Amino acid sequence: MLTVEESIVINKPRLAVWEFITDSANVPVYSSNVVEYELVSGEKQEVGRICRWVVKMAGRRLEMTDEMTEVERGRGGKYVSKDATIPYTLSVHCQDVGEGTKVTWHQEMESLKGFFKSADPIVLKLYARDVRSNLGKAKTILES
């Protein structure tokens, strides 16, 4: 199992940060590696919502569909892949820190298979860099 965990403090109230980060319409706005993202069914910040998306990583297009399986309004959510090149679970948590909000992105993915398994450390490093960059972009947008 491969794990990426990144955190950032955004100087905005927790509810505003959570609403921005978990709104499916905003994902392509702050995620430079996401080339397509659409709400397929359900409500955007409700359990059962399903989104289809395409991410570009290490020069490859990876198609995914995930379902929001847990939500605690203003605090966090959990997403589980339904159909993905690399199966994963993702948890996003928001907590108060002083006048701002700490956002923690925790994602667990299956290892690449077969011949490509040796690329796991490289893919993990590239993806962690994308997550850090995306959280930084969300911070810039929200604080401007």
Regions from the PLM with identified roles:
Residues 1-40, 46:
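Hydrophobic ligand-binding cavity/cleft-lining segments
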Residues 3-5, 61-65, 86-91:
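Short, surface-exposed coil-to-beta transition loops
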Residues 12, 29, 63, 129-133:
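Generic recognition of short, well-ordered alpha-helical interface segments
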Residues 15-18, 132, 136:
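Amphipathic alpha-helical segments that line or abut small-molecule/effector binding pockets
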Residues 38-84, 97-102, 133-144:
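Glycine-rich portal/gate segments that line the openings of hydrophobic small-molecule binding cavities
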Residues 80-133:
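Beta-strand/loop substructures that line and gate deep hydrophobic ligand-binding cavities in soluble
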